[in-house]
Structures are given as C-alpha cells and as structure tokens.
Curated annotation (Swiss-Prot):
Record-listed E.C. numbers: 2.8.1.4
Annotated organism of origin: Photobacterium profundum (strain SS9)
Boundaries of every THUMP domain copy: 61-165
Pathways per UniProt: Cofactor biosynthesis; thiamine diphosphate biosynthesis
Function statement: Catalyzes the ATP-dependent transfer of a sulfur to tRNA to produce 4-thiouridine in position 8 of tRNAs, which functions as a near-UV photosensor. Also catalyzes the transfer of sulfur to the sulfur carrier protein ThiS, forming ThiS-thiocarboxylate. This is a step in the synthesis of thiazole, in the thiamine biosynthesis pathway. The sulfur is donated as persulfide by IscS.
Record-given protein name: tRNA sulfurtransferase
Catalytic machinery residues: 456 (cysteine persulfide intermediate)
Subcellular locations according to the entry: Cytoplasm
Keyword ATP-binding: yes
S-S bridge residues: 344-456
Family (UniProt): Belongs to the ThiI family.
Length: 482
C-alpha cells in the first residue's frame, strides 16, 4: 500500500530554501501522526512530494484520514507501484488494472514522468490511451470531461498507477506560521476561525473565558480537543481556562447597561493579550463577523482592539452565518456548536452600536481591575493532550422539571434588568430573585431544607448554575423549564 502526497501548490511559489523547509516540516508532521497508527509505516521526503508506505492494508483508512486532514497537502494519490520494461509494458499493466472499468465509458489518460526515459509524458499518454481505445471496443476517448481519467506516473524505474485521488486540506504545513491564541467559546464561529488558522499553518492555542461553570468548560474542552486531534495533532498546544464569572459580576454591578457588551469584550482582550504575551504568542484569533451582534460594528471593534498591543485576527469578518455553519458541518464541529450554551444573563438590554472611548473609560473607571488581574493570575493551563485523559470526568446530570412540587421555591436567576422587564409570577408558588452572578456567594444563605428550581429565559444559565451548585455539594437543586 502506497500513498503519494502532493504538497499545496502555494508552497512551490516560495524560494528553494523556504520550499525545502515547508516540505521538511510537512514530512515531520506526517511522520509524527502515522507512527501512531503503526511503527511499520514508512515516510519518505522526495523533494517535490512525500511517499507514505505501509505493509498492512488494515491501516489504510486510518492513514488516509490523517493525510486528508493534514494542513499543507493539496491531494493524495493512492497508487499501485510496479516496475516496467517499456511503453508497451506500461500499457499492458494499465489495461489489466482499468480495462473493465472503461467498458461503455469515455476516458482520457493523464501521465506524469520523472527521470530519464526514451519517451515523453505526451507520448506516454498517447501510447497508453491509444492502446486502451483499441483494446476496449465499447470505450471512447474524450479529452475534456471524460467519465474516467486514467492517471499514471512514471517515477524513474517505477510505474505508479493511480487507484484513487483524494482531495487534501490545502493551506500550509502546521508550524510554518507563528502561533496564535484562539478565544474559543465552543460555538460555530470560534471553532471555524480556529480551524482556518490551523489550515493556514499556525499552531492554535486555546483560551476559554468561563462564564458558566464546569459544564461549559467540559464542552469547550471537547471541541478544542476535537479540532486539535483531527487537524493539528502533530503540534503541542495549550488549553487555557480563565474563570471570568467574577469579572462578569463586577461588570453587571458597576457598568452602565448599554456599555456592558463592549466592556466585557475589552476585558476579554486585555486578559487574552496578557496570556499571549506570557507565552510569546503573536496574535489573537476571534470568530467575530461584522455586524453579527451589536458589539461587532466597526466602531465597537476598534474600541475593543484598543486595549491590547496584540494583533487581533478575525478570519470570519466578512462571512455570512450560513457559510460559517456550512464549514462547521464540513469540519465536524457543528454538533458541538449546536449544543453549546448561549448565556441569557450577560446581554445588554439596549447595547450600544457606536461606543465612545471617553464613555467606555468612564464606565471602566468604576471597575475593580484587581479582579481582572486575579483571574488572569489564576488561569489554569493544561496540555491539550491531557483533555482526553479527563474524558471520563462528566458533569453531573441535573433534573429538568416542568411541574413544581409542594414546598419548592422557584429561584429566578436572571439579571435585575431582565427580571424587571418580565417578572416571573406563578400562582401559589414562592418565587425568589437571586441573580446568577450572586449564586456562588449567596445561595448558601438560603434555607437549605427547601428544594430550589432555578429559572432563566433560555434554560441554559440555570442548568449551568445548577451544575456548579451541585458540584459544590448542594443536593436540593433542579431546573425549572415550564
């Protein structure tokens, strides 16, 4: 079993020294990954292509999957390798392989050649094509858009008959570009933007701002590990988790409602910029798209960028959401994104679409930046390879109910603005209001002999907070979903 790996054409536009370096890195990346399949797999750097051979056909699917998902590969040829004597021998071997497939079909022959021979590539195509046309009476030659393209390559004294041509990922080999730090939330946008930078050759490290407890973190770890394992597992990268709940609580307490979204994004960038600087990472990557939400207007993005010296890359800036979802579906992150939470508490009621620097700075003057410094200092950093080892750690299940039992108290955890706008009133049931950002410090003050049903508009924040409280030893928690 043999595969011929063709590097992405852009690599050959580079100078000789850069091309050699890129192909050497690609060779190393392939070698690292296929050796996990079997130590018997051999990888050879042939200057303009890479050959991968294996003795055990049972490894084919795994090896092929790796090659199709490795950045820097344009396509992979799955070939049958033999020796040949002359042009007629090549024709006879080709006829034996494809003769039956050509019956009743149109076809053409495409040949490539390396080495010194007494025939040219065009002569090879004509000889083999003419012979096949005579040998298979029901077949006919068609040079444009044929039913079957017969591909053969002559490499010095070897004949490679192409069994299949598999499209690659394209882009540049992983590690040929500088590292980036992706601000990952687990949704459609951040997953796709991370993938695009992996494809372009950057080692992507992941920074997660945790707004919703362990369940959200588990989900984001899973999608980050999936992206790394499928497309970038030749690289060692970091997963950094920052508990941002104290920051959100401070924003909700101190910042004007209309400015909250932009201020929160500015806090993200301040924190991510410091993390990137700590690890020598040159740029931040976000999944923001122009105009998708209120904080993503040009004015607001400029205000967000101003708080860090790090370069901020937004590969999806002009993409439509539908196109982003299509890519997520193709790369395998759609299912993760569909189940990832959106938070109902950290949303301004009347968000500004044209933030003013002076007003932002005035609001941020009320913010205690010691809180931001503390959560950055306490950031948890792990090797992304260790996530798989933790896969057995599952968040506890939380019961969802639509009926309220006797004596149970409904705990409305929405923000004060949401609660004021749409008060929750249930006949015959006691409803208490305790904003989600105060649960960690004030839930213990409630009567623990009672059962509490957590409520929010979308049911996401309530479930995540219920998971958090359950993991902290409270067993009197359910989620109310009428």
């Amino acid at each position: 079993m043999k595969f011929i790996v063709k590097p992405h054409p852009e690599i050959f536009c580079k100078s000789d020294s850069v091309r050699k370096r890129f192909i050497k890195i690609l060779d190393s990346n392939i070698r690292i990954m296929v050796k996990r399949v079997s130590e018997s797999v051999a990888v050879y750097n042939r200057r303009y292509h890479i050959e991968v051979t294996a003795n055990d056909d049972s490894d084919r699917d795994q090896i092929l999957a790796i090659l199709m998902q490795t950045p820097g590969i344009h396509h992979t040829l799955e070939v049958k390798q033999t020796e040949f004597k002359d042009l007629h021998d090549i024709f006879e071997q080709t006829l034996e392989l494809v003769g039956e497939q050509l019956e009743g079909k149109t076809f053409c022959v495409r040949a490539k050649r390396r080495g010194q021979h007494d025939f040219t590539s065009i002569e090879l195509e004509r000889y083999v094509g003419g012979g096949l046309n005579q040998a298979v009476e029901s077949a006919s030659v068609k040079l444009k858009n044929p039913d079957i393209t017969v591909r053969i390559e002559v490499d010095y004294d070897h004949l490679h008959q192409v069994l299949h041509r598999h499209k690659g990922l394209g882009g540049f080999p992983l590690g040929t570009q500088e590292d980036v730090l992706s601000l990952i939330s687990g949704g459609f946008d951040s997953g796709v933007s991370s993938y695009l930078h992996i494809k372009r050759g950057s080692k992507v490290h992941y920074c997660f701002f945790n707004l919703g407890g362990p369940a959200h973190e588990i989900g984001v770890k899973q999608v980050s590990h999936f992206l790394w394992k499928k497309y970038g597992s030749s690289a060692k990268v970091k997963f950094i988790s920052i508990d941002f709940e104290p920051v959100v609580a401070e924003i909700l307490e101190k910042v004007d409602n209309g400015q909250m979204g932009v201020v929160l994004k500015r806090m993200f960038m301040r924190a991510a910029g410091q993390v990137a600087e700590r690890y020598g990472i040159q740029a931040l990557v976000t999944g923001e798209a122009l105009g998708q939400v209120s904080s993503q207007t040009l004015t607001n993005l400029r205000m967000i960028d101003n708080v860090t010296d790090s370069l901020i890359l937004r590969p999806l800036i002009n993409w439509d959401k539908e196109d982003i979802i299509d890519i997520a579906r193709n790369i395998g992150t759609e299912e993760f994104a569909k189940t990832m939470p959106e938070f109902c508490g950290v949303i301004s009621k009347n968000p500004t679409i044209k933030a003013v620097k002076a007003k932002l700075e005035k609001e941020e003057a009320n913010f205690d930046f010691a809180i931001l410094d503390r959560v950055i200092e306490e950031a948890r950093v792990m090797d992304i390879r260790d996530i798989e080892k933790q896969s057995q750690e599952q968040a506890p299940e939380i019961e969802l109910v639509d009926q309220i039992g006797d004596g149970a108290i409904v705990l409305d955890i929405r923000s004060p603005d949401e609660e004021d706008e749409s008060p929750l009133v249930i006949d015959g049931v006691e409803v208490k209001h305790l904003p989600f950002y105060k649960l960690a410090t004030q839930f213990g003050d409630l009567d623990q002999d009672k059962e509490y049903l957590l409520y929010c508009d979308r049911g996401v924040m309530s479930r995540l907070q219920a998971l958090y409280l359950t993991e902290n030893g409270y067993g009197n928690i359910k989620v109310y979903r009428p």
